[in-house]
Amino acid sequence: MADIKLIARRVESMKHRAYERDTQMANILAVRQGKMVEIFPDMFPEGMSHAMVANFIDVAARDLAEVLAPLPSINCSTTNVTSDNAREFADKRSMIANNYVYTSRLQTQMYPGSDQYFSYGFLPIHVEADWDSKLPRIRVEDPTGVYYERDRFGRLVAYAKRYNKTLIELVNEFPENDRALLGQFGYDQNLNQEIEIIRYMDKDSIVLYVPSRKDLVLSIAANPMGKMTVVVAERPSIDGKARGQFDDVVFVQLARARFANLAMEAAEKSIQAPLVVPDDVLDMPMGPDAIIRTTNPNGVGRVRLDIPAATFQEQSALQSELRLGARYPE
């Protein structure tokens, strides 16, 4: 049986190597959720919870996902087109293959899966045995918290997925480990605190354990298939590291949001600029339709706030850079 200590060290090594990737994935997720202010709080004024520009990255990702998600038609062919038996056999194989896709709801899964593929740069897809229906099930998994290793031939040799569950959920699902999960405080603690659990798989074993509880093993079993039942589709990259399509345009989106804030601030200051009046004005009436008596009406006005025209040109340039970096032309 697998050694949990070796597995835990291997998973920690994979997590350490993917630290930069995890940070970038968290930034992309926050930007797509409209939480750019939480990532770069110094770039936004106080009291502003969202950026004042359209979320271009989210719009582009959804649009590209809708293009990639539709599945091709699945048809099996035969080398002997003159044989009725061969054609019937090919038709039956086509029906079987399409039934696998239909029962797995693969078409429905491909829309969020394609979205995550563009956003994060890779997508795990499981092919698991459904022993109840006696059918293979295809499952698309969220890449967040996924770590994996390949051998020199590019084959997957280790796969780990990080989940978060509340303490009470784990106790209810694994009552035999309640003492180890709850610890010395028992039920007299915050049972809604989230606990990280790891599901690890290789060709020999499948393990579910809790790192924060001294690598407590919740479930361990031999891999019934004897091989990896997951594949990871990756976007092509020059250095072999997974990179999302929008990794390079996050800061361009930030610059657009920053320019929008500055433009709004400039407009506000222009409207609220101090009032300039000639020296002969002794009484300053305020309010709508107020009358200012002066012999020099041309001297009455607000302090001008000159905004360079290049500011608005730069906003257009940032929009072009955003489309170029995201490979999303007009």
Placement of each model-derived feature along the sequence:
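Extended, helix-rich architectural segments
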Residues: 1-187, 316
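Long, contiguous amphipathic alpha-helices that act as assembly "spine/axial" helices in icosahedral shell
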Residues: 42, 53, 61, 88-129, ...
